[in-house]
Amino acid sequence: METLQNSYIYFVSDFILIFGVILSAFIGLHIKNLAPKWHLRLLNTILALMLLGFLPFLTGFLKLTNLDIFSNLVPFTDYNLTFHSGSVNITPLNLFFKFLITLCAFITSLLSFGFVKKLNRKISNFTSLFLISLLGGYGVCISNDFITLFLSVEILSVALYFLIASFYNKKDKEKNSLEASVKYFIINEVASCFMLLGISYIYLNLGTINFSDINTIAINKILPSTPLLNIGEILFFLALTFKIGAFPFYIWLMDVFKGSNYSIGLFISSVIKTVGAAALIKTGSSLGCFNSVLSFALILCACITLVIGNLIAARIVKKEGDIKDFLASSSISNIGYVLLGIAFFTKSSITASIFFLIVYLISNFGLWAAFMLVVRNLRKFILKSETSKYETDYGAKKLYVDENLGAIKGVAYISPFFATLVVICLLSFAGFPVMAGFTAKFYLFSNILRSGIFSVYPLLFAAFASILAVYYNFKIISFMFQKPDRLKIYKKKPVFNRVNIYIFILSMAALLLIAGFFLSTPVINILNNFI
């Protein structure tokens, strides 16, 4: 046990985040005419400083790669500290998840500039709510009891309600943001009731809400498992499946994505998914030790999530449906793999799940950046063509205003380099050999298979889902190389000239290629030492 006064270094990023929330709220209240770009620059600066707060732990992370070039570094990750009567816990894994969600938030902020700057006076609300939701994510990562975890989840969720609704504009494409926010609020409150009921049953049976105490009880078999405990565990984890958009609470994800801004969808598919995975690992490692009922329930949820998510994605791609619907269904299907690894509650399977989550985030950011660039250019073209002859002669508005997957047809003819980068991201999602997605799936499946003979059955569902993923990802690739019917329209479309997004997509594509060959082993070594 250490006192907080002697351990400020572990909370540098937290202090910067709290200061950022206060500063952004103060600027929003007292500096009314500040341009939107300065609010976004402030947000990016705060997030960058938060990332710098993790530098003291970098040597320890590099040391754990077991690479010779880092062998002389001094590790700074051998600790397990608790604060505030055991309600807060600092471990290497907790710090890693804090770093991961901060990095995801920073990338989301950078990619969202073109979609957020139109908020004008409401931009200060966006920056404040964005940081408050991140504060809730931090609380989830360092929580060590159910009450701290629940309060942190609610802070994140309440901020997200208003964050979604802040884009409401009945004249714009995000006119359904208010409806999406209300839907998310109602369903989330139902899930919160399940979570509280589950926590009460767990406390009634075990007499504690502290994760460390529960883990001690489970390992030493001090108290037997009871039906009441099983019900409490299932209710609690059902509520968590809502937070990550897994079966049976996954429909909200598509509604929220469809009605909200692209930046909100990216935030949910990256930061919220990562926070949900951290909560599942944190609580599952304690409660999963009692019996196999919880493990079976989560495996069932994961298998159904995998199949449903990929079936929905395949149907959307076949019909050339809405881009946001496809991104939502892809998010649902990929979180199923993460949940499947966590559900077995073994060190190797959890390590494989976290590695898959990292690869998913890289692929996800690359794909979202690509689609956001396509949509931005698409909206510019429609805006410019509304009073020109191209709308009349070629039906530009009719063809592209829906922002569906058909909008990427012929992209390879406009920018072959851009199309190649998108292909790399899609191949990783499909699990194509030599790509990081293939390495992550292979490592996940092999570790699940070692869990026992019954692990074969969930892998059959995962294999079927992977086949579906290959189908629809290759279908999207084929769209980009299809020659458009009206080539004149594409010639008039603006060139993909956003250099910063190009560089970002190139970086993500390079990571996916390099990770498939070289980076997988060092990253897995780090994760093995964390768990």
Briefly describe each language-model feature range:
Residues 1-531:
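Alpha-helical transmembrane segments of multi-pass membrane proteins predominantly involved
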